[in-house]
Amino acid sequence: NNRLTVAYNPDAPTPKKWLQFLSELLQPEDIPTLQEFLGYCLLPTTKGQKMLMLIGKGGEGKSRIGLVIRSLLGDSMNTTSIQKVESNRFSRADLENKLLMVDDDMDMSALPKTNYIKSIVTSECKMDMERKGVQSYQSQLYVRFLCFGNGALTALHDKSDGFFRRQIVLTTKDRPAGRVDDPFLVDKLLREKEGIFLWCLDGLHRLIGNNYQFSISGKARENMETVKRSSNNVIEFLQSEGYIRFKADSEASSKALYEAYQRWCEDNAQKPMSANRLSSELAQNERLYNVEATNNVHVGGKRVRGFMGIEVVNPLPY
C-alpha cells in the first residue's frame, strides 16, 4: 500500500519557490521531462519504461529534488545505490512495494552487469527476491530509479541499445560562481508541498495523455547519443573519416574492417573492443548505415564474411 504523505488540496497555490529552483537548475525545455517523471513516480506502474539521470558537475543542488520527493512519497521511497541494486542479491527485496529509489551520489564506475536494472525498469514479470534467512520468493517490482551524479551510467560489457534506451539523461546548468547557497532551501520548498504535488500530478496527466511517452528535449536526446558514443567507441569509429567509406557498390571483409578499427583505436588512444562487437554493431544497424552482412566477400580467391556497402580506405595488404 503506497499511501502518499501529502494532502490533495486542489486550491494549493502555485509552488513559486520550487519553480524558481528548477529554473536555476535545468534548461526550460527539460523541466517538463522532470515533471512527468516525478508524476510517473506517484503511480505503481512501470509503463514508462525509463529511469532518470540528473547529471551535473557538483554543487548545483540537484539532490534537493530527492529530499522534496521524499516528503511526498514517505516510506514509498528508498535511497540506495544503483550499483548495489545490480550486485547485491538482497538489495532488490528492499525495493518491493516502493514507488521510487533515489541514488543521490551515483558511483561513476561502469556496471559489470545490467540484467537486474534493465528488468526492474521495464518490470514486465516477477523476479526472485531474497531476504536474509528467508526462503526466496517471486514478486513484481514497480519501483522507478532517479539518479543524481557527475556523469552518466555506463556498463562494462552491455553496449546494447536496450541499456541506453531505458535512460533519460538531463544535464543541469552550471552553478553560478558567486551564488550563496540557502541552507534553509529545502524547508522553504517543503512549505509548498501541496502545490508541488499538484505540479507533479499535471506531469502525470500529460504523461498518461501521451501514452507514457516522455517529453524529451533535443538536448536530452543529444546527451543520450553522447553517452552512447563515449561508452561504445565502435559507433565513433563508424562515424569517423579516413578509415572507412560507405558506398553502395563496395564491400569489405570483417577482418579488413577490424584492422581499420584497430588503426583508428591506436590513432585515437582508444581501447579496441572485440571483432565480434564491431561486426554485431554493423549487423544490428544495417539500415542506419545502408550495409548488408554477407558471407560472400571475395578476398584472394576465397569467400569470407564481411559487409556490402562499406569499404576500407587504404587497407593493409593481404
Predicted regions: what is each one?
Residues 1-318:
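Feature primarily recognizes SF3-like P-loop helicase cores of small DNA viruses
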